[in-house]
Amino acid sequence: MTKPILLASLAALAIALPAAASASPANVVVVDNERVYAECNACRSAQASLQAQATTIQSRQAALAAPLKIEAQALQAAADALGGKTPDAALQARATAFQTKQNSANQELQRLQQNLQSSQANVLRQINAKLGPAIKQVMLAKGANLAIDMNNTLAVGSGMDVTADVLVALNAVLPSVSVTPGAATTTTGR
């Protein structure tokens, strides 16, 4: 009588063991995404190029602002000299021309800034398109089934940080990126 109970118990145990073995604990790796974006080869090159574009915009802004400032001061002095009288047609024409120049300068700077922002977004899109697969490649190599950003952790055990491995994998598949505005640099109001 005890033999059938013993056999039934062993059979139940044999069925339960594979189920318990398949529920192995999660193997987690941690990636410092900030470090990846700062240190990958394509990221560094793109950052230098984007910084140069930003500097060019600042220089253009200064070049446009200097003559406008002088002209604004001259217009203000002419208006102050009127002592409250109505400006003549020539002064009104100068003021209108100044406003047109100022609007044109603002539009140019806005277009340059939009191009820079579009270039930044395009760079991020290219990096992100390769970063995910690079992380998955490292996860597979490490036998991990979960990757977490370093900034979303409270504590990390030794051997869990695979940022260096991700950098190697990303640099291999993404040697450079295009630092140009993306396809859609304007909004269409859709």
Pin down the residues of each PLM region:
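Bacterial N-terminal signal peptides that target proteins for export
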Residues: M1-S9
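Amphipathic, charged alpha-helical segments and their helix-to-coil junctions
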Residues: T2, S22-R190
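Bacterial N-terminal signal peptides
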Residues: A8-L17
